[in-house]
Amino acid sequence: MEPYAVVQTGNKQYQVRKGDVIDVELLDGISEENKEVLFQEVLFVFDGEKASVGSPTVGNAVVKGELISFVRGEKVVAYKYKKRKNYHKKIGHRQNYLRVKICDLVM
């Protein structure tokens, strides 16, 4: 089996392998000039032979990624309605994401 890791960012967990492309919530310090993304909250690492489980994180394990683009998610629509009161409210929201390509798993 090929190596993989489980990283946590934006209060969500992602299982990643080298070469994967994932969409994560916006991170501080990332811009068009600074394209390197480091995920330091690595919860689990499998290197092909043995597994390391963190408590809560695996020490000195880092997942390196590269920013591909800024993307926006699908539109989510919330609709409020109260019967017999002539009240309707339509609210839309689109979340901003970073599209990141995983370059390396450092253990």
UniProtKB/Swiss-Prot annotation:
SUPFAM superfamilies: L21p-like. GO terms for biological process: translation. InterPro entries: bL21-like, bL21-like_sf, Ribosomal_bL21, Ribosomal_bL21_CS. Disulfide bonds: none annotated. It comes from the Bacteria. Belongs to the bacterial ribosomal protein bL21 family. This is Large ribosomal subunit protein bL21. GO terms for molecular function: rRNA binding; structural constituent of ribosome. The lineage of its organism: Bacteria, Pseudomonadati, Chlamydiota, Chlamydiia, Chlamydiales. Keywords: Ribonucleoprotein, Ribosomal protein, RNA-binding, rRNA-binding. Part of the 50S ribosomal subunit. Contacts protein L20.
